[in-house]
Amino acid sequence: MAVTVETLEKLERKITLSLPLTTIQTEVDARLKRLARTVKMDGFRPGKVPMSVVAQRYGYSVQYEVLNDKVGEAFAQAANEANLRVAGQPRITEKDGAPEGEVTFDAVFEVFPEVKIGDLSTAEVEKLSAEVTDSAIDKTVDILRKQRRTFAQRALAAAAEDGDRVTVDFEGKIDGEPFQGGKAEDFQFLVGEGQMLKEFEDAVRGMKSGESKTFPLAFPEDYHGKDVAGKTADFMVTVKKIEAAHLPEVNEQLAKSLGIADGTVEGLRADIKKNLEREVKFRLLARNKQAVMDALVSKAELDLPNASVQAEIARLLEAARADLKQRGIKDADKAEIPEDVFRPQAERRVRLGLVVAELVRANNLQAKPEQLKAHVDELAASYEKPEDVVRWYFSDRNRLAEVEAVVIENNVTDFVLGQAKVNDKAVSFDELMGQA
């Protein structure tokens, strides 16, 4: 097979492939013979259809398949011999004027770029740190108590206040007409916890059992119910019951109910601290990893293969449609979503992927078996039966590949932090958790 390689521009290349017609015809004949042994046609016994009839019926499609296969094989062989790392699928077209006895094709494609990573010692990375405080443990204890609270009916003269559970009947109308989801009986919610729109909670707060009132409520423009979003409804609400919340005491009984082995408050707080420290570690790793990747990309020079960018745009577009479909949007598969919306994100993902791959290759940062095991053990530690979770990960190659990708990212993060100028910054627990 004769091969020529031509550089068009930047990452674009062209290979000219020449194939002997005899090679193609030999394969076509072989496939038609195999087909003749199994093909069924009216008027002939199975396996007894004449070759001329088989060729007349199936010759064109078989020749098309053979050409595709042979050109694909020739392209792969040529790219391999030329040490080309092909990005995406080639555009293959047949050329006119081929030498006698040959068929010639042009394959135009992109190659992956050379990645140049600058001096990482001049990169600056802000590295966050945070600690689990007693206050954070106290807040978690309060959350656990709320999850186990009980309710007791309050006196009829008592007014609803934050923390109470109220049972109400309500009906809303827009321009005098009822709307879907605007009416309910014996509906319960907790006042002051954001389960209802603020105007609704404000109206109920201070009401007593047996009282009714009407009030206007403006639905936000971004309200999930599109039929009422941005509109104002008139609501009638009747309070039927008000119940006060009672939180369990922080004692041995609470600790035991939460599965604490020694059944002590100290053991409960220690267990909470351990879990929060694990969460803090993962949050810090994610934030610091993002800072490292930003610094790494800023120090890299490379051209982006358009084929890779377009493939990433297609993935993001598919994910966006799936999200719309999950939200109940009609005809999500047909929704017009401009590709350019995803281009910046796609370009960053492709750029980051290529830079990370080069750093891993150049510095042997691949995931080691002991690192995979340690990471899986850490993921499994928070489960009731960690050994089952470990087996679950190692029993599936795809799941293990996801773990491997995370470990490689961690290796890259550690490597860059060891090279770059690191600015340490302590943040509060609440700030890290997005609660500040």
Swiss-Prot record:
Positions of the PPIase FKBP-type domain: 163-248
One of the protein's GO biological processes: protein unfolding
Compartments in which it is found: Cytoplasm
A molecular-function term among this protein's GO annotations: protein folding chaperone
SUPFAM superfamilies: FKBP-like, Triger factor/SurA peptide-binding domain-like, Trigger factor ribosome-binding domain
GO cellular component: cytoplasm
Entry function: Involved in protein export. Acts as a chaperone by maintaining the newly synthesized protein in an open conformation. Functions as a peptidyl-prolyl cis-trans isomerase.
NCBIfam families given in the database record: tig
Family statement drawn from the similarity comment of this UniProt entry: Belongs to the FKBP-type PPIase family. Tig subfamily.
Domain free text: Consists of 3 domains; the N-terminus binds the ribosome, the middle domain has PPIase activity, while the C-terminus has intrinsic chaperone activity on its own.
Protein name: Trigger factor
Organism: Acidovorax ebreus (strain TPSY) (Diaphorobacter sp. (strain TPSY))
